[in-house]
């Protein structure tokens, strides 16, 4: 079976390597069997493309409480289709509490506020692109500061346009 073979190969790359396994295959079939098999071989796993607490629950039923597992919940992509990822992540964190070897990851950050949401929920890991990190560094500005900066930006834009009335 190709995915298993690839996972075993990737695992040889180093001690800190986590092997990514999708929660389902391209046909939508849950990958519980391969997750269980690799987990029992003490291979560190990152179960990816997770969206629901129900999927997290199925993953938890397939693993032991020793081998390290990251459950990557695609919060940003859920938001992209109008779904609130927060309840699913909250439930997933609660379900995984008894598993000291499991970490919940907030994947596909779309805006700086996601960082605050992930932190408040108790996510163990959040993947943040550089463009969002730059914005997070601006946290703490007052609304008054933001207003002035915004209006200054409007002034600069209007001067650049050379538009006269």
In which residue ranges do the predicted regions lie?
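Active-site beta->alpha loop and helix N-cap motifs at the rims of alpha/beta catalytic domains
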Residues: 1-37, 41, 75-78
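Catalytic alpha/beta core domains of metabolic enzymes, predominantly
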Residues: 29, 41-134, 140-158
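A charged N-terminal "starter" segment
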Residues: 13, 156-164
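Short amphipathic alpha-helical segments with coiled-coil-like heptad repeat character
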Residues: 23, 126-127, 162-164
């Amino acid at each position: 079976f190709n995915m298993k073979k690839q996972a075993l190969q990737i695992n040889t790359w180093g001690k800190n390597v986590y092997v990514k396994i999708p929660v389902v295959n391209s046909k939508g079939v849950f990958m519980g069997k391969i997750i269980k098999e690799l987990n029992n071989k003490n291979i560190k796993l990152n179960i990816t493309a997770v969206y629901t607490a129900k999927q997290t629950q199925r993953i938890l039923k397939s693993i032991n409480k020793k081998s390290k597992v990251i459950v990557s919940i695609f919060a940003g992509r859920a938001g992209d289709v109008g779904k609130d990822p927060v309840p699913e992540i909250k439930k997933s964190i609660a379900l995984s509490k008894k598993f000291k070897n499991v970490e919940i990851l907030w994947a596909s950050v779309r805006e700086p506020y996601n960082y605050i949401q992930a932190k408040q929920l108790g996510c163990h890991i959040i993947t943040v692109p550089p463009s969002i990190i730059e914005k997070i560094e601006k946290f703490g500005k007052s609304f008054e500061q933001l207003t002035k900066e915004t209006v200054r930006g409007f002034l600069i834009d209007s001067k650049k346009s050379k538009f006269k009335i």
